[in-house]
Amino acid sequence: MSDMRLIVAGAGGRMGRALIRAITESAGATIVGALEAPTSKWLGEDAGTLAGLPANGVKLSADLWALSADADGILDFTVPAATLANVAIAAQRGLVHVIGTTGLSASDDAVIKSVTNQAVVVKSGNMSLGVNLLAALVKQVAKSLDDNFDIEIVEMHHKAKVDAPSGTALLLGEAAAWGRGIDLNAHSARGRDGVTGARRAGDIGFASLRGGTVTGDHTVIFAGPYERIELTHKAEDRMIFANGALKAALWARGRAPGLYSMADVLGLGNAST
């Protein structure tokens, strides 16, 4: 099979540059497009040079329709508004759409789901193998422990991250909720401050820390009577997300239309969300 021809959305950002490197260093894929916002200062720049690699002749552009004429897929780690705009074009063009954008609302998710009867979409709050295995463990632990074990999720990211809790924290929260057989939206505790009263039984708590250059640390705490279990993942380089996204795109090529997750890509069944 020929190399999969991929577009990187948000090519000028940290994740975009990591994705360019991952594709360039891979076997089985090639970069044919680099997408940026119409106001980006990187428009017209060479994608390879921008990623710290030799020039590859792919110039950053704001025109996804033109870029997608000869593409097979798009890797999208941008912002919700950009992802929603990309979804429509990717579906029309028949592109595999790998979405790692975080901060998406329920209505955003509904828009994405609406195209999956005609398009292949792989969407996850985290594309790394380690986090998705962690989610599988969280499901099993939450299912196995009695409900007198309180669940708290602590995450830390670099100071430039704009959404909280992180997409990964929410993924882990969904995994814990699945294990408990509850709806996360109805049992989510965020932003505790002041006199909050006693902890509500059954809640899944979230705490978000921001500072420095932290790529991503996540800990799921199961706090029970006189004992505590902590499951932790620490991301040391964005390349783990980029390589995971590339793996997802290659896996999704030729699949039937639908909405897939990294659990599907990694063969974990329903072990993560």
Curated annotation (Swiss-Prot):
GO terms for biological process: diaminopimelate biosynthetic process; lysine biosynthetic process via diaminopimelate. It comes from the Bacteria. Keywords: Amino-acid biosynthesis, Cytoplasm, Diaminopimelate biosynthesis, Lysine biosynthesis, NAD, NADP, Oxidoreductase. Its EC number is 1.17.1.8. Pathway: Amino-acid biosynthesis; L-lysine biosynthesis via DAP pathway; (S)-tetrahydrodipicolinate from L-aspartate: step 4/4. GO terms for cellular component: cytosol. Its main location: cytoplasm. (S)-2,3,4,5-tetrahydrodipicolinate binds at residues 158, 167-168. SUPFAM superfamilies: Glyceraldehyde-3-phosphate dehydrogenase-like, C-terminal domain (SSF55347), NAD(P)-binding Rossmann-fold domains (SSF51735). NAD(+) binds at residues 10-15, 36, 100-102, 124-127. Disulfide bonds: none annotated. InterPro entries: DapB_C, DapB_N, DapB_N_CS, DHDPR_bac, NAD(P)-bd_dom_sf. It is an enzyme of class 1 (oxidoreductase). CDD domains: DHDPR_N. PROSITE patterns: DAPB. It catalyses: (S)-2,3,4,5-tetrahydrodipicolinate + NAD(+) + H2O = (2S,4S)-4-hydroxy-2,3,4,5-tetrahydrodipicolinate + NADH + H(+); (S)-2,3,4,5-tetrahydrodipicolinate + NADP(+) + H2O = (2S,4S)-4-hydroxy-2,3,4,5-tetrahydrodipicolinate + NADPH + H(+). It is found in: Cytoplasm. The active site is at residues 157, 161. GO terms for molecular function: 4-hydroxy-tetrahydrodipicolinate reductase; NAD binding; NADP binding; oxidoreductase activity, acting on CH or CH2 groups, NAD or NADP as acceptor. PANTHER family: 4-HYDROXY-TETRAHYDRODIPICOLINATE REDUCTASE 1, CHLOROPLASTIC-RELATED, DIHYDRODIPICOLINATE REDUCTASE. Belongs to the DapB family. Catalyzes the conversion of 4-hydroxy-tetrahydrodipicolinate (HTPA) to tetrahydrodipicolinate. This is 4-hydroxy-tetrahydrodipicolinate reductase. It comes from Rhodopseudomonas palustris (strain BisA53). The gene is dapB.
